[in-house]
Structure formats: structure tokens, C-alpha cells
């Protein structure tokens, strides 16, 4: 069992003077790719890795997240100057750590165009795989599967990072439509973003007192041990 999350702390800010060896991130990503199972071995997602040199893109991501926050709260703000004013008058969001993260991962859906030998043999025999659909209900079905597998990959990756003394966080407060991500900064994206993950060495963490007031739901609320009715 992966116990690396036992001492997990939410990093509100990362140490910009601390440098993670690129090979450590590369090895963690490769191990996650190798160890994460996938339905029919399609892995219907892509992980876009932004390193230290992508400071402008990370800054832009922060403002995209903040704009999405205003939308979620029923007060949509798209003007950047108005967003800056909003930023000054509201509590700093947890996803502010995107700006200082050494690495940021953006997960998107991936459509398979080059099936492996076994997959192709089954396709020739009449099998239809939703992971190869380019639109319609089947692509949406593959998207749901991608969400699940992204969770599995990101958990494996997080466990490896935490085991190496590297902090991580997850962000879902961002525009879910690719058209809202400016091409001048995010031309590498080829599908709607599904998850953002930050990676680095934390310099400031969520207060223990806040954490104590924010427990998970009770075990019995989440896990239902079904008993046979006689």
C-alpha cells in the first residue's frame, strides 16, 4: 500500500531557490507511466510537463484559475485589471502555488490513432474502442475513463514525489474548455485540460489549525460495507 500520503501537507508556496534534479522528475514520470494500469492498454490521456522555464505560462494559468473562481462564485470577471483588484481584496487561493511551482503538469484527454498489434487485430475482428473516437458519445465515454486513469497516474506520481521529499498539489479550479486557454501561451495543448498538478519543494504550508478544522468525511460516510439481509 502507498503510505507516502500519510504525512502529506498542502504547499501554499514553493521554494523558488530549490532545484529538483530533472532526472528525478523524469524517473518519477516514467515509473508512473510504467506502473499505472489502463483499460485495454490505451492510456487515453496525455501529461504536459512544464518545467522551470515556463514562468510566464504558470503566471497565466494562475489568472485563468482566478477567473474561473469568480465564475464558480457567480460573479464572472474576465477583465485582467478587474481580476487584479479582485485578487487584492480576497483571500489568496491555494492554487496561487502554481506561480512558484518548479514543475506544473497539465493532464488532457488523448485520442489513440496508432493502436498496438493486439488492439488492431481486435479492431479488424469488429471491436470498437471508445479511446479512438474523435467525437460523439464514445469520445465522452473515453473522457470519463480518462479522468479515472489520470487519477491513478497522478496518485502514483505523487507517491513517488513524496517519497523523495518533493511536494505536490492538485488543482481543478480552471477553465475546462480549451478555447479559454490563450494559444500564445498554451499552443502545446491539443485537448481540454482535465487536471493541473504542481510539483516543487514547499516553503510555506497550510496551517495545522486550518487542517484540523477541515477533516475528511467519516469513514462510514464513504465506505459502505454491505451486509447480506437474511
Q: Where are the regions that the model predicts?
A:
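A generic local secondary-structure boundary/capping motif
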Residues: 93-96, 183-187
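A glycine-rich helix N-cap at a beta->alpha junction
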Residues: 69-78, 184-210
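A short secondary-structure junction signal
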Residues: 116-120, 173, 208-209
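N-terminal amphipathic, basic helical "cap/leader" segment at the start of enzyme domains
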Residues: 1-104, 109-110, 114, 225-230
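Short, acidic Gly/Pro/Ser/Thr-rich loop/turn segments
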Residues: 112-115, 204-206
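Short secondary-structure junction motifs
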Residues: 42-45, 163, 167, 194
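Small-aliphatic-rich amphipathic alpha-helix that forms the alpha element of a beta-alpha
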Residues: 28-34, 105, 111, 121-182
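Phosphate/diphosphate-binding glycine-rich loops and adjacent basic-rich segments that engage nucleotide
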Residues: 208-230
